[in-house]
């Protein structure tokens, strides 16, 4: 059986974002899930940073995973993936020079596209975790990513948080990332089509939205009209896998108490122990809630 090469998959991703349709991502977190997603007909998958942290570290999404750990998981997926996979590369694991290293490692892993976000990560001493870096630094990261890639088919996607910025600032940021050469713009936190339309009319590159299933954005035809080619609804498959594992093991142990009947969200919270990290952040980093 013929297999698609990494470059074939990257070309395939380019075709998706050049089309007139909006495609929803499958959450892929290991080789098996990548094969399942492709077999079920998904056109594109995504390895989420939060999911990688859960899968590799059993840790909450506090930017604790390292580039090496993330790239190793991406490589495992890349060995078998027969659909284009987007890597959520967070902040590029450091400054612009770290971003270059990130691109090198993820390109070798076989990733078709990667997002670099402008959130100030990891959380800084005395700063909120939602703070953003300056536009100038964000532009530098995108330019560095483009410089580092060897295969021009690898898509570099600039990501920003539209949920915490005024519309005009979102427009300004994303326009500058576009001018820096980003192949697409990813936004998280878009509220509705009105806000999306205000922003999209100022951009010419394809858009990617992290919607987390926002019901106000459930119209694929309208998303496509506004330039959205990729929609990320979340990572339900991963959380369903956690739930299935827990329920299977619970049944083996014959534990059927009401207190043990936990939802996937409750399980993730229980076993990643975020309270510990919050306490440590307050104690060692002066981070206020």
Swiss-Prot record:
Domain of life: Bacteria
Molecular functions per Gene Ontology: magnesium ion binding; methylisocitrate lyase activity; oxaloacetate decarboxylase activity
Disulfide bond residue pairs: none
Residues where Mg(2+) binds: 88
Gene3D superfamilies tied to this protein: Phosphoenolpyruvate-binding domains (3.20.20.60)
SUPFAM superfamilies per record: Phosphoenolpyruvate/pyruvate domain
InterPro entries documented for this protein: ICL/PEPM, Oxaloacetate_deCOase_bac, Pyrv/PenolPyrv_kinase-like_dom, Pyrv_kinase-like_dom_sf
Essential cofactor(s): Mg(2+)
Recorded catalytic activity of this chain's protein: oxaloacetate + H(+) = pyruvate + CO2
Family matches, as Pfam families: PEP_mutase
Binding, substrate: 50, 159, 235
Segments passing through the bilayer: none
Keyword field: Decarboxylase, Lyase, Magnesium, Metal-binding
Cofactor mode of binding and number, as noted: Binds 1 Mg(2+) ion per subunit.
E.C. number(s) listed in UniProt: 4.1.1.112
Gene Ontology BP annotations: oxaloacetate metabolic process; propionate catabolic process, 2-methylcitrate cycle; pyruvate biosynthetic process
Enzyme class: lyase
Self-association and partners: Homotetramer; dimer of dimers.
Annotated PANTHER family: OXALOACETATE DECARBOXYLASE, PHOSPHOENOLPYRUVATE CARBOXYLASE
Family, per entry: Belongs to the isocitrate lyase/PEP mutase superfamily. Oxaloacetate decarboxylase family.
Role played: Catalyzes the decarboxylation of oxaloacetate into pyruvate. Seems to play a role in maintaining cellular concentrations of bicarbonate and pyruvate.
Name listed for the protein in its UniProt record: Oxaloacetate decarboxylase
Organism: Pseudomonas fluorescens (strain ATCC BAA-477 / NRRL B-23932 / Pf-5)
């Amino acid at each position: 059986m013929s297999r698609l090469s990494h470059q074939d998959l990257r070309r395939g991703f380019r075709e998706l974002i050049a089309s007139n349709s909006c495609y929803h991502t499958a959450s892929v977190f290991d080789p098996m899930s990548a094969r399942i997603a492709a077999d079920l007909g998904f056109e594109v998958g995504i390895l989420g940073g939060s999911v990688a942290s859960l899968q590799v570290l059993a840790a909450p999404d506090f930017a604790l995973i390292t580039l090496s750990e993330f790239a190793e998981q991406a490589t495992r997926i890349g060995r078998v993936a027969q659909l284009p996979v987007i890597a959520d590369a967070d902040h590029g694991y450091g400054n612009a020079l770290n971003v270059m290293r990130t691109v090198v490692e993820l390109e070798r892993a076989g990733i078709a596209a990667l997002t670099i976000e402008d959130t100030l990560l990891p959380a800084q001493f005395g700063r909120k975790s939602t703070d953003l870096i300056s536009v100038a630094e964000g532009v530098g990261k995108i330019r560095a990513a483009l410089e580092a890639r060897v295969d021009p088919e690898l898509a570099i996607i600039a990501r920003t948080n539209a949920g915490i910025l005024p519309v005009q600032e979102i427009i300004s940021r994303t326009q500058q990332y576009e001018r820096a050469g980003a192949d697409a713009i990813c936004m998280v936190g878009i509220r509705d089509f009105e806000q999306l339309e205000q922003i999209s009319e100022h951009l010419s590159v394809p858009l990617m939205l992290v919607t987390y299933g926002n019901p106000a954005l459930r119209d694929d035809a309208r998303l496509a009209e506004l330039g959205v080619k990729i929609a990320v609804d979340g990572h339900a498959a991963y959380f369903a896998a956690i739930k299935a594992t827990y329920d299977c093991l619970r049944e083996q142990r014959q534990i059927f108490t009401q207190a043990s009947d936990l939802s996937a969200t409750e399980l993730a919270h229980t076993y990643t122990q975020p309270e510990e990290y919050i306490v440590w952040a307050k104690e060692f980093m002066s981070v206020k809630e």
